[in-house]
Amino acid sequence: MAKKEEYVRKPDWLKIKLNTNETYTGLKKMMREKNLHTVCEEAKCPNIHECWAVRKTATFMILGDVCTRACRFCAVKTGLPNELDLQEPERVAESVEIMGLKHAVITAVARDDLKDGGAGVFAETVRAVRRRNPFCTIEVLPSDMMGNDDNLKTLMDARPNILNHNIETVRRLTPRVRARATYERSLEFLRRAKEMQPDIPTKSSLMIGLGETKDEIIETMDDLRANNVDIMTIGQYLQPTKKHLKVQKYYHPDEFAELKEIALSKGFSHCEAGPLVRSSYHADEQVNEAQVREEARKAAAKS
């Protein structure tokens, strides 16, 4: 008889209260009417009800809803994507305006089937949002675009307020966790983004609970700082379906608090760490606090 798989029980601190008020329902209806996708829904984010119903924010996912990769932690659909929708940038910009966002996050599925990795549509979405929403800060969260410098330059030339690219996991686990991605290529992507536009903050996220050690987490912090990453987020990995990688450990909130302090001591201008933290969670607060910390640091250096 086959041995039944053992699963780590989800702790109480990961239980959340769902809030599906009229704001949440209205935003969901608008997304469907405009044929837009959000990573909040596609990736089964645990914070969707707080962000949509309480904070009235969302992370737009462009370039369709089918990814060319099949990472073992991610719930986004995989397969052969549809053709590009060239009207998508304007629909995103209009939705940002209707929602009255002060900070918009734009992410995308990986489009390894496209020569430019989708960089052209990504850049046009940034420009479209800025034209209609001049006071809205814009954060972009692209794939590694297969490490293509020209594609990254296309995106950086659009001048987003933050370039976010997630390292996702520690070096040792990357081959098992991230399909068609490498740890070193992600670091290089972040380094090159900073070299192209030194004044644009860079950001990366690490999910933990996949079997990494504390030393490996700290090593990842050091690697990100060595490549001039400014902002870091650390969150608990949650298994989206039984087909995905199992959770090896649920970290206690106190452990996240300790990791945050370590990250800040390494020189990150901001670190958000907690069981339910995701790359885009409270992103508006992250960019504001990071700017304040950086200005204070520059002022101290001059004195």
UniProtKB/Swiss-Prot annotation:
Transmembrane segments: none annotated. One of its GO terms (molecular function) is 4 iron, 4 sulfur cluster binding. Keywords: 4Fe-4S, Cytoplasm, Iron, Iron-sulfur, Metal-binding, S-adenosyl-L-methionine, Transferase. The keyword Transferase applies. One of its GO terms (cellular component) is cytoplasm. SUPFAM superfamilies: Radical SAM enzymes (SSF102114). Its EC number is 2.8.1.8. Residues 53-269 form the Radical SAM core domain. [4Fe-4S] cluster 1 binds at residues 40, 45, 51, 280. Pathway: Protein modification; protein lipoylation via endogenous pathway; protein N(6)-(lipoyl)lysine from octanoyl-[acyl-carrier-protein]. Coiled coil: none annotated. It is found in: Cytoplasm. It catalyses: [[Fe-S] cluster scaffold protein carrying a second [4Fe-4S](2+) cluster] + N(6)-octanoyl-L-lysyl-[protein] + 2 oxidized [2Fe-2S]-[ferredoxin] + 2 S-adenosyl-L-methionine + 4 H(+) = [[Fe-S] cluster scaffold protein] + N(6)-[(R)-dihydrolipoyl]-L-lysyl-[protein] + 4 Fe(3+) + 2 hydrogen sulfide + 2 5'-deoxyadenosine + 2 L-methionine + 2 reduced [2Fe-2S]-[ferredoxin]. Its main location: cytoplasm. Binds 2 [4Fe-4S] clusters per subunit. One cluster is coordinated with 3 cysteines and an exchangeable S-adenosyl-L-methionine. [4Fe-4S] cluster 2 binds at residues 67, 71, 74. Belongs to the radical SAM superfamily. Lipoyl synthase family. This is Lipoyl synthase. It comes from Halalkalibacterium halodurans (strain ATCC BAA-125 / DSM 18197 / FERM 7344 / JCM 9153 / C-125) (Bacillus halodurans). The gene is lipA.
